[in-house]
């Protein structure tokens, strides 16, 4: 049964060398959204992948009107890819904008619950670190680094969010319109922290939905030392950012966490 959504859903999937994952991911997302959100679009944002991901995305788009492709001339970072996609989706009339990875780390089966949560929230976070969430197929060191990074960001910024670094989210249109995307400075995964923090600064209602994060099925991880270092210095810089003008949360509801 379709959800009572007030507008179109756009799912943004950034890609760089994700040829092995893209076709099954698009099929899985379509299977989840066809019934609950018939008015949906999957926007693949490809940074000129040398493995031919962009060409494959074009073929998928040619065969399916629910798929579109945004080509970028070079690899410029996760943040700029998402910002370009957000603007594209907003210009096309999106009411809900989903961001998710292409490698099945973010299971499309969570989309119905996250979209349902977005009916009375402004930003929904797929959270690994609330009750019911977790990670699979990670080694001890990666678990420590991830947990430590979330604790560091949460403590430094003073926000009641368990998973600030996750990249599975649903934005209501108003959040992306209110945030000055030109002010976003992060290039890598610090982008996730920065967007959520700015939404909280502005008084938007942010909720967390538990997810199980699974290590990628195929391909290579995009995590690098430079990405980790950017996150380390960006968090204190965000703390010094003057509060933005506050905006009333959706429906005037107080914040809560799922």
Please give the residue ranges for each predicted region:
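Acidic helix N-cap motif at the loop->helix transition within catalytic regions
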Residues: 20-24, 51-60
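Hydrophobic helical membrane-anchoring modules
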Residues: 1-7, 158-159, 181-258
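Acceptor/aglycone-binding surface of glycosyltransferases and processive sugar-polymer synthases
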Residues: 68-91, 96, 108-189, 216-231, ...
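Residue-level signature of catalytic and energy-coupling elements of molecular machines
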Residues: 22, 29, 85, 103, ...
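A conserved acidic beta->alpha catalytic loop
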Residues: 46-55, 104
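N-proximal low-complexity "stem/linker" segments adjacent to membrane-targeting elements
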Residues: 1-31
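Short beta-strand/loop segment that forms part of the nucleotide-sugar
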Residues: 38-49, 70
């Amino acid at each position: 049964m379709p959800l009572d959504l007030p507008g179109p859903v756009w799912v943004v999937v950034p890609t760089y060398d994700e040829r092995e994952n893209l076709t099954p991911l698009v099929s899985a997302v379509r299977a989840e959204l066809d019934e609950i959100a018939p008015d949906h679009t999957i926007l693949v944002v490809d940074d000129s992948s040398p493995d031919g991901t962009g060409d494959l995305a074009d073929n998928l788009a040619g065969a399916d009107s629910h798929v579109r492709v945004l080509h970028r001339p070079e690899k410029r970072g996760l943040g700029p890819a998402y910002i370009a996609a957000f603007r594209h989706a907003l210009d096309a009339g999106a009411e809900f904008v989903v961001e998710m990875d292409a490698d099945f780390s973010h299971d499309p089966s969570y989309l119905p619950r996250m979209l349902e949560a977005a009916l009375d929230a402004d930003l929904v976070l797929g959270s690994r670190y609330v009750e019911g969430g977790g990670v699979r197929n990670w080694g001890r060191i990666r678990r420590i680094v991830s947990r430590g990074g979330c604790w560091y960001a949460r403590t430094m910024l003073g926000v009641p969010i368990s998973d600030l670094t996750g990249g599975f989210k649903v934005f209501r249109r108003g959040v992306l319109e209110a945030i000055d995307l030109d002010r976003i400075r992060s290039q890598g995964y610090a982008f996730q922290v920065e967007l959520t923090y700015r939404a909280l600064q502005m008084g938007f209602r942010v909720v967390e939905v538990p997810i199980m994060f699974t290590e990628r099925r195929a391909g290579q991880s995009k995590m690098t030392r430079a990405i980790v270092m950017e996150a380390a210095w960006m968090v204190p810089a965000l703390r010094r950012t003057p509060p933005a003008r506050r905006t009333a949360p959706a429906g005037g509801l107080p914040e809560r966490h799922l």
